[in-house]
């Protein structure tokens, strides 16, 4: 175990997957977390849990959807090992598509806000010339499907944005850009969905996420067998694909 403290800023720190990722990190090495999100009480509860696990924690109550929110000042004066962007939303597609304002909000939550934050964090990593930026995407972005194409399209956009940023830093090997692609995960965001054998626990996905971050993987399907499933779905001929109810 390394004795040097690992500094991580977590955006959307109330995410169930992010919480388990931080727990896995704290179990492996000394850590300092800056937890950011809107729900102050929930952030403090998470911070106290992590402190009991030996981590140092600071909390910043911010609205990550507000482009005028000055959260960047909380990052000044420190050298960051990890920026972890974890906020997102899984909308009811039919209801959301019926409301043009709701469509814009979901695109903001799942793509525009993460992309904006990634841009700021990337400039910090460029100044440092090292560090990791990890963002939670989804297997839903691999192919547009009738059941969730609104959500999936935002995650596809996020994947493309992340890939481009990774290309930007290809000449700086000490900077890692990691896209985490969970499959169906048992979290509060999926509480209303019927659970099946393809669901994984947030704890399992969070631990796998930390492993991928630690290794600096470019793209990580969580669990890895989702790559097989999505590879099949991606390569289904259109005529066959359109006969499915995916």
Model-derived segments and their meaning:
Residues 14-15:
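Conserved glycine-rich cofactor-binding loop
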Residues 29-45:
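Conserved glycine-rich Rossmann-like NAD(P)H-binding loop of the short-chain dehydrogenase/reductase
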Residues 88-104, 147:
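Conserved mid-core segment of classical short-chain dehydrogenase/reductases
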Residues 118, 154:
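Active-site helix of classical SDR
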Residues 138:
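Residue(s) in the substrate-gating loop at a strand-loop-helix junction
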Residues 143-149:
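Active-site loop immediately N-terminal to the catalytic Tyr-X3-Lys motif
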Residues 179, 194-231, 238:
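C-terminal helical subdomain
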């Amino acid at each position: 175990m390394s004795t040097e403290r690992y500094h991580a800023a977590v955006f959307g720190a109330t995410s169930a997957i992010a919480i388990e990722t931080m727990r896995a990190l704290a179990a492996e090495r000394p850590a300092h977390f800056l937890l950011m999100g809107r729900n102050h009480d929930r952030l403090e509860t998470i911070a106290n849990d992590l402190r009991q696990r030996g981590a140092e924690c600071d909390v910043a109550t911010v609205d990550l959807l507000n482009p005028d929110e000055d959260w960047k000042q909380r990052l000044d004066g420190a050298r960051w090992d990890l920026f972890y962007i974890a906020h997102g939303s899984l909308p009811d597609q039919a209801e959301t598509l019926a409301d043009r304002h709701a469509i814009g909000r979901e695109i903001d939550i799942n793509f525009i806000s993460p992309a904006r934050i990634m841009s700021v964090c990337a400039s910090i990593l460029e100044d440092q010339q090292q560090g990791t930026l990890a963002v939670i995407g989804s297997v839903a972005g691999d192919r547009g499907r009738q059941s969730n194409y609104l959500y999936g399209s935002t995650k596809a956009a996020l994947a493309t944005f992340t890939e481009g940023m990774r290309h930007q830093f290809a000449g700086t090997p000490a900077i890692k850009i990691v896209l985490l692609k969970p499959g169906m995960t048992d979290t509060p965001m999926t509480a209303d969905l019927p659970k099946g054998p393809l669901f994984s626990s947030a704890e399992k996905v969070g631990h796998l996420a930390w492993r991928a971050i630690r290794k600096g993987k470019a793209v990580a399907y969580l669990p890895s067998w989702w790559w097989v499933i999505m590879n099949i779905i991606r390569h289904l001929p259109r005529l066959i694909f359109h006969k499915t109810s995916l």
